[in-house]
């Protein structure tokens, strides 16, 4: 048995969209078959059935009503699927044989425009990426708003990932032969992004003509070839999916990555710029604090401002001056905000105009929105700052469009543009005439019903209408005996009624329905003419929408500044960040009002280049560092800042290495990720950058970590091409000595108060290094069980021991045969336990013994810290090792313990077999047997 004609047609269509779920129109339903049906039934919770199709087995099938498709499409697209819509392209009743069908649209995560599934304050970007040797280009479009941005740079994965993080596209279009390793990197970092591939030729084909046709501002000589290829590839994909050239995408905006403050992927996450670390939601982010916008357009624009802070002084100061003027004119600001509240999403409405999907109600929303523009222009004339004056000169009031919409459309039109009831009375004579005929016909129907009731005496008689039988007279069976013989023609029998018609009724029906049908056709024709006129003026409306969104952003920043007592920062060119009584903008909003402790900051590229911050965990070091970065970002956005005074130097890049970012499932340890991030910072930071480093070196052994942290500080301060402004938090108290040896290092610490064996974090950053880490106290605050805390205190007391002794004699373990004698002079090392707390080792009596791990790394470490080491050979039977320490002594027993602990920490358990794990455990147990 062969395939049925319908199934053959289905399979032919499906062949052209293998990566999509095919919605195949059959009558009033969209049907899905085979694997598509299985996926859709699971995702949409539909019943999976089957259909005979000429194969040995029934084809799996599920379906949805065509009029409810948007809801189901939205759910599938949100889950990352692509949907191909296959429609009937001819009237089934007029078709001979199988109905002609074809794909009219492909809906993908990056091309979806249904406002009910899009976040109104967030763009829905689709991105294209093109790589050519060592250069790459990227383009980003939001087809719902018409934005189209392109850039290019030398190819570095980090640069591409930063741009992806900034724009957060839902979908990325790549050349089909691009390396899978690169795709894997993207998916690993951004698992929710959909990847689509197109052929190399689609980036090249008819490139200049395509771009000229699409963009009003395109000049082929202004763009690098690689940029044009990236843009052309994205346009091809949009046309391929939308089956239409979208007129709202009419301007290409090229930007250089270095035109904005660079905030890399990790820093965006660590600083919680647009979403918090835990829930990945807006609440608790900088955007959450600053967003008091009144329009969807303004909300999207403010997000862009925050994602792309400025690095040029003039535009920053223009924004700051505008915000200041709003704060000095509160009544005018309130008038502006009140009108902004009445403005709908102009950008997305005209986007629907371009895609021919706009309805009359949305055009009424457009009319109401642009009706507010003349008032906004009037308010702008009351300001004096350059930014507002320029806006007042450039804003188009769109009065001609408002006049047309107001004259043409009913205030409350039908939702569907093919049901009539759209055009206002007086706009078109033919519409008025047909409406009168329709109205008169219905009046005649009403009078007929009243006449028949009176003449037959049947009070329940009624004249009704349905699409199957048209108009009819309905009489209940209880009153059939009252029906005059021959008065009516029987049409239909129901269980408790009879339906009749008369020649006169049918004649009037033809007039009424003819008028209705013609009226619907004419109203739809007029609507499309209005829509086409608006489409011709899309660029005018987009320019006005952008000005409105900028005004909304400035009003939002002014509102936040007023509510939170922010001040206007001074933007300087001195490479200096000076903040008096600065506050963390987010933290102060989530704790009781007035409880946040403010702090001062002074960072420059000279005497205060690297601020070395010591102090216990939970004391506020990380909050303080983030606070400085966020205040800098806010200033470069053009926002007032949470401080008493702020003098901000413009930064070109902000880097952070704060908090854990392990990826154990990918086989990456904490330390490896940390080192990768530090490496990225040291390679890419400049003297104009702001760098935040927290606990560098903590993921490895104490000695290794201290050495790395020390070396990183030296590199930052001594490298003439770097010398970036740096905040460096650490538990390695030994590093505080660097203030005396390295120019630009300054010690600061978090103030702590001790009251009755309890500690209180004062959250105040003070000059000088910390002398304790309070590790046990922090553990107690964190809720560790009392027995653990008490035992820790006992161990610490034992380690500290008797500090009056000035030397330590340690006998070597029996397993060592060395005759070396090591004497370490004053100012040797402090060591740290694995919680980061400082360990001050005790002075042991001659009866105390400890195993000395004698390896080259220990010797090298001691040597690198300029300790006096004298080695001399003695008789094997009188081996003696003496370590003389000024204020404390090192118990090498703990060095061995530390090494075992580090070995345990570095076990890659995810990649071990059970037997390997058992053997590793047995090996560790054996190593501990040597320790007393």
From Swiss-Prot:
The keyword DNA repair applies. Transmembrane segments: none annotated. ATP binds at residues 615-622. One of its GO terms (cellular component) is cytosol. SUPFAM superfamilies: DNA repair protein MutS, domain I, DNA repair protein MutS, domain II, DNA repair protein MutS, domain III, P-loop containing nucleoside triphosphate hydrolases. InterPro entries: DNA_mismatch_repair_MutS, DNA_mismatch_repair_MutS-lik_N, DNA_mismatch_repair_MutS/MSH, DNA_mismatch_repair_MutS_C, DNA_mismatch_repair_MutS_clamp, DNA_mismatch_repair_MutS_core, DNA_mismatch_repair_MutS_N, DNA_mismatch_repair_MutS_sf. GO terms for biological process: mismatch repair. One of its GO terms (molecular function) is damaged DNA binding. Pfam families: MutS_I, MutS_II, MutS_III, MutS_IV, MutS_V. Keywords: ATP-binding, DNA damage, DNA repair, DNA-binding, Nucleotide-binding. The keyword NAD does not apply. It comes from the Bacteria. Belongs to the DNA mismatch repair MutS family. HAMAP family: MutS. PANTHER family: DNA MISMATCH REPAIR PROTEIN MSH1, MITOCHONDRIAL, DNA MISMATCH REPAIR PROTEIN MUTS FAMILY MEMBER. This protein is involved in the repair of mismatches in DNA. It is possible that it carries out the mismatch recognition step. This protein has a weak ATPase activity. This is DNA mismatch repair protein MutS. It comes from Clostridium botulinum (strain Langeland / NCTC 10281 / Type F).
């Amino acid at each position: 048995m062969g395939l049925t004609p319908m199934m053959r047609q289905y399979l032919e269509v499906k062949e052209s969209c293998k990566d999509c779920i095919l919605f195949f129109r059959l009558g009033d339903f969209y049907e899905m078959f085979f694997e598509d049906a299985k996926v859709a039934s699971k995702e949409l919770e539909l019943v999976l059935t089957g259909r005979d199709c000429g194969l040995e087995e029934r084809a799996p099938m599920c379906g949805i009503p065509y009029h409810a498709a948007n809801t189901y499409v939205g759910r599938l697209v949100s889950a990352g699927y692509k949907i191909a819509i296959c429609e009937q392209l001819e009237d089934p009743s007029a078709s001979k044989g199988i109905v002609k069908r074809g794909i009219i649209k492909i809906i993908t995560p990056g091309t979806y425009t249904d406002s009910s599934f899009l976040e109104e304050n967030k763009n829905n970007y689709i991105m294209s990426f093109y790589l050519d040797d060592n250069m790459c280009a990227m383009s980003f479009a939001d087809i719902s708003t018409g934005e189209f941005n392109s850039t290019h740079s030398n190819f570095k994965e980090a640069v591409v990932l930063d741009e992806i993080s900034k724009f957060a596209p839902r979908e990325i279009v790549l050349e089909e032969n691009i390396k899978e390793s690169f795709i894997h990197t993207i998916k690993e970092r951004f698992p929710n992004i959909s990847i689509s591939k197109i052929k190399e030729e689609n980036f090249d084909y008819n490139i200049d003509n395509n771009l000229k046709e699409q963009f009003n501002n395109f000049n082929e000589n202004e763009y690098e070839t690689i940029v044009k290829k990236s843009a052309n590839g994205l346009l091809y994909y949009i046309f391929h999916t939308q089956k239409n050239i979208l007129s709202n995408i009419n301007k290409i905006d090229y930007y250089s990555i270095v035109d904005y403050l660079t905030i890399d992927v990790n820093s965006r996450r660590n600083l919680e710029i647009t979403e918090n670390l835990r829930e990945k939601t807006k609440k608790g982010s900088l955007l959450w604090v600053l967003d008091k916008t009144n329009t969807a357009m303004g909300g999207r624009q403010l997000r862009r401002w925050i994602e792309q802070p400025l690095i040029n002084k003039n535009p920053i100061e223009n924004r700051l001056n505008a915000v200041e003027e709003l704060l000095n004119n509160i009544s005018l600001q309130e008038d502006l905000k009140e009108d902004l509240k009445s403005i709908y999403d102009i950008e997305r409405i005209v986007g629907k105009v371009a895609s021919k999907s706009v309805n009359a109600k949305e055009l009424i929303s457009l009319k109401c929105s642009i009706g507010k523009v003349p008032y906004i222009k009037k308010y702008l004339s009351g300001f004096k700052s350059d930014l507002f004056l320029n806006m007042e000169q450039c804003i188009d009031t769109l009065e001609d469009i408002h006049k047309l919409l107001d004259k043409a459309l009913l205030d409350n039109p039908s939702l569907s543009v093919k049901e009539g009831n759209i055009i206002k009375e007086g706009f078109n004579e033919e519409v008025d005439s047909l409406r009168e005929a329709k109205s008169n016909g219905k009046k005649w129907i009403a009078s007929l019903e009243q006449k028949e009731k009176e003449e037959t005496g049947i009070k329940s008689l009624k004249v009704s209408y349905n699409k199957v039988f048209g108009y009819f007279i309905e009489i209940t069976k209880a009153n059939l005996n009252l029906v005059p013989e021959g008065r009516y023609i029987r049409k239909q029998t129901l269980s408790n009624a009879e339906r009749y018609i008369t020649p006169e009724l049918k004649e009037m029906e033809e007039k009424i329905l003819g008028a209705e049908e013609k009226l619907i056709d004419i109203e739809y024709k007029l609507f499309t003419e209005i829509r086409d006129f608006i489409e011709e003026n899309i660029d005018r409306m987009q320019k006005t929408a952008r000005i409105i969104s900028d005004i909304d952003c400035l009003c939002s920043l002014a509102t936040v500044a007023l509510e939170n007592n922010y001040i206007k920062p001074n933007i300087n060119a001195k490479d200096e960040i000076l903040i008096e009584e600065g506050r963390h903008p987010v933290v102060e909003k989530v704790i009781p009002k007035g409880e946040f402790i403010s702090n001062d900051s002074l960072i420059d590229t000279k005497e205060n280049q690297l601020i070395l911050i010591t102090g216990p965990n939970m004391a506020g070091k990380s909050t303080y560092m983030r606070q400085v970065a966020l205040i800098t970002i806010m200033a470069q956005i053009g926002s007032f800042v949470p401080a008493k005074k702020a003098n901000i130097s413009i930064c070109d890049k902000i880097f952070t290495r704060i908090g854990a970012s392990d990826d154990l499932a990918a086989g990456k340890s904490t330390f490896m990720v940390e080192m990768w991030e530090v490496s990225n910072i040291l390679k890419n930071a400049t003297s104009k950058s702001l760098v935040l480093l927290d606990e560098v070196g903590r993921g490895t052994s104490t000695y290794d970590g201290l050495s790395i942290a020390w070396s990183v500080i030296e590199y930052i301060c001594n490298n003439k091409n770097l010398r970036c402004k740096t905040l460096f938090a650490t538990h390695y108290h030994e590093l505080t000595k660097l203030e005396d040896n390295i120019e630009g290092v300054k010690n600061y610490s978090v103030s702590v108060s001790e009251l009755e064996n309890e500690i209180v974090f004062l959250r105040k950053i003070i000059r000088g290094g910390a002398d304790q880490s309070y590790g046990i106290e922090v553990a107690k605050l964190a809720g560790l069980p009392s027995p653990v805390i008490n035992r820790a205190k006992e161990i610490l007391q034992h380690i500290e021991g008797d500090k009056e002794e000035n030397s330590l004699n340690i006998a070597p373990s029996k397993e060592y045969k060395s005759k070396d004698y090591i004497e370490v002079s004053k100012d040797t090392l402090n060591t740290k336990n694995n919680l980061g707390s400082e360990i001050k080792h005790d002075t042991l009596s001659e009866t105390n013994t400890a195993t000395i791990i004698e390896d080259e790394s220990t010797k090298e470490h001691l040597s690198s810290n300029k300790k006096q080491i004298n080695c001399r050979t003695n008789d094997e039977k009188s081996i003696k090792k003496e370590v003389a320490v000024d204020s404390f002594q090192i118990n090498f027993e703990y060095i061995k313990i530390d090494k075992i602990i580090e070995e345990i920490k570095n076990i890659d358990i995810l990649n071990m077999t059970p037997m390997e794990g058992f053997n590793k455990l047995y090996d560790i147990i054996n190593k501990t047997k040597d320790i007393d």
